[in-house]
Design a protein with these regions (language model features):
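Core nucleotide-handling region used for phosphoryl-transfer chemistry
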Residues: 1-417
Length: 417
């Protein structure tokens, strides 16, 4: 199921911004964003577009062209703004067939408005997905030519294990109210790429053990199987390198439980290697019990991770009551990373001690710092190359000499008549 990026919600609150006459701060769900003054009233329905929404290139959104039509976390007059709000009439301008009279709170407008999700160019899914060494590629081609054995396709993420994803705290008002006081633990949300390692015993007759493994071990990215123990698979992917580094297949065979280890990998070429690490690392954030069809509790998570000689994500607090306060968790997310204290942490994940629910709070200051970094990189890429004047003069001399020599003349010479 795709993430809803644009939907109809009510304006919960409006408050002034210091030293600002033409703008004010609106609250939609748990999000705070800057809007034009007097454009909305409390209780109005509005079209809210989340951060990382990429709006279509249509005339009504032309003002977003300098931002490449992307909605980002920004700060205006010391007020952090996350998302953008439009009057309901905007939908009709983009999609004339839309019936405003039938609009209801919570309606997903992502497809109706033609909105897509922004993805980082260097995301591991884009940059490293299905990467193979030339030897593996040649071996696959050779098997096809000689034995007519087709190369193995990795396949989609297994349906019997939940994908690694967390909902932002700004959309969890109902849960905070219902579960207030529930014992939770809070862990750092690491910036990297999610990975899942699955061990599953295969049910079959006695012959199955003679002609193959009695188990299946899978290494997966967020959306795909990268490695399958029962097939010839790609081992050059960073997720496979982590598998080898921590000897995960052997350890999970020894553990002999139908489980999925889920974590975050980070290091060179992954999300810009924000922690400045020389090699890939993995931190475990959850373990899914395939037989019980649920995540294991905190005590079991800690015990299994220790038995497998793996590291958990940094844990900040344990056994603390859930607080019904979105702003509290947004504020708590703003701190230094425990992996590298020189950088801000991406955010936090709040999970019940029994793992019955979880959600994330992303650090707005971290998002702002990343946007600033990306903007500087783009400016450097777009900036034309310049040379000091003396370099240009020397280059001109070299070019002149080269032309003269190609004409068969001595340097600085004249053509004889």
């Amino acid at each position: 199921m795709k993430r809803a990026l644009a939907y109809i919600e009510t304006i919960k609150e409006l408050k002034p911004i210091q030293d600002a006459d033409k703008i004010e701060c609106a609250t939609i769900l748990g999000w705070e964003l800057v809007v034009k003054k007097d454009e909305f009233k409390v209780g109005d329905l509005a079209v809210y577009c989340e951060i990382d929404s990429v709006l279509p290139e249509v005339p009504v959104f032309e003002f977003l062209r300098p931002k490449k039509f992307r909605i980002k976390t920004i700060k205006i007059r010391k007020q952090i703004s996350q998302g953008i709000a439009f009057p309901l009439s905007i939908v009709k301008e983009v999609n004339p067939s839309f019936d405003i009279d039938k609009a209801r709170i919570g309606d997903d407008l992502t497809e109706i408005l033609g909105i897509s999700k922004y993805e980082l160019d260097n995301d591991i899914e884009e940059e490293l997905q299905e990467k193979r060494s030339w030897i593996e590629s040649y071996y696959g081609w050779l098997k096809w030519k000689i034995f007519r054995i087709k190369p193995v396709k990795t396949g989609s993420f297994p349906s019997y294990v939940p994908k690694t994803d967390e909902t932002r705290v700004q959309k969890m008002e109902g849960l905070l109210f219902d579960k207030e006081g529930t014992a939770c633990y809070i862990a750092e949300k690491c910036e990297g790429s999610s990975c899942t390692y699955i061990y599953r015993k295969l049910n079959g007759n006695w012959l199955s053990g003679l002609f193959g493994n009695k188990y299946c071990f899978l290494a997966c990215s967020r959306n795909q199987i990268i490695y399958n123990s029962n097939k010839s698979s790609n081992k050059t992917h960073p997720i496979c390198q982590i598998m080898t580094k921590y000897d995960l297949e052997r350890k999970l065979i020894k553990l002999n439980k139908n489980i999925a280890i889920q974590g975050e990998i980070f290091g060179p070429k992954i999300q810009g290697n924000v922690y400045g690490l020389p090699e890939y690392q993995m931190r475990v954030f959850s373990i899914y019990d395939i037989d019980e069809k649920k995540y294991v509790d905190y005590e079991s998570l800690w015990a299994i991770t220790s038995e497998l000689e793996l590291n958990m994500v940094p844990v900040i607090q344990t056994n603390v009551p859930l607080i019904n306060d979105i702003k509290y968790y947004v504020g708590l997310s703003n701190d230094k990373s425990k992996i590298n204290s020189n950088i801000l942490r991406e955010g936090i994940v709040i999970r019940a001690m029994d793992s019955s629910f979880s959600f994330k709070s992303i650090n707005p200051e971290y998002l702002l710092s990343q946007e600033s970094k990306i903007s500087k990189q783009q400016q450097q890429e777009e900036k034309p190359a310049t040379f000091p004047r003396e370099t240009v003069v020397n280059m001109s001399d070299e070019i002149r000499k080269g032309i003269t020599l190609r004409r068969g003349l001595p340097t600085g010479g004249k053509r004889s008549t």
